Amino acid sequence: MNNSKDNPFCGAIARKARIYLREGLDCVYFLNKAGQAESCPACTSLVFQGKTCEEHKYNNNLLSWQAVRQLERQMPQLQSSN
């Protein structure tokens, strides 16, 4: 599953993801096409090998831990307004 040849940013994405995991995230998150945070347990285990899963191989929209925390804070507000 070494996809660094396909996406030149894959190694950089994996390095950033490792930093975010060390800063407190429990999982790697990407922004999906609908603009929502999407966790990826497969990427979470692969980033320590410098890789991402096949599904996220071309998704450079890695979410930082700050962005994930901000989205988590907004979720109860969005759910209570429905």
Swiss-Prot record:
Q: Which InterPro entries match?
A: Acc_prot_5b_avian_CoV
Cite the entry's keywords alphabetically. Answer: Eukaryotic host gene expression shutoff by virus, Host gene expression shutoff by virus, Host-virus interaction, Inhibition of host innate immune response by virus, Interferon antiviral system evasion, Viral immunoevasion
Q: Supply the name of the protein.
A: Host translation inhibitor 5b
- Example GO biological process: symbiont-mediated suppression of host gene expression
Function per UniProt:
Involved in host translation shutoff without degradating host RNA. By suppressing host gene expression, facilitates the evasion from host type I interferon immune response.
Q: Which domain of life is it from?
A: Viruses
Organism the protein comes from: Avian infectious bronchitis virus (strain M41)
Instruction: Please indicate if the UniProt record lists Repeat as a keyword.
Output: no
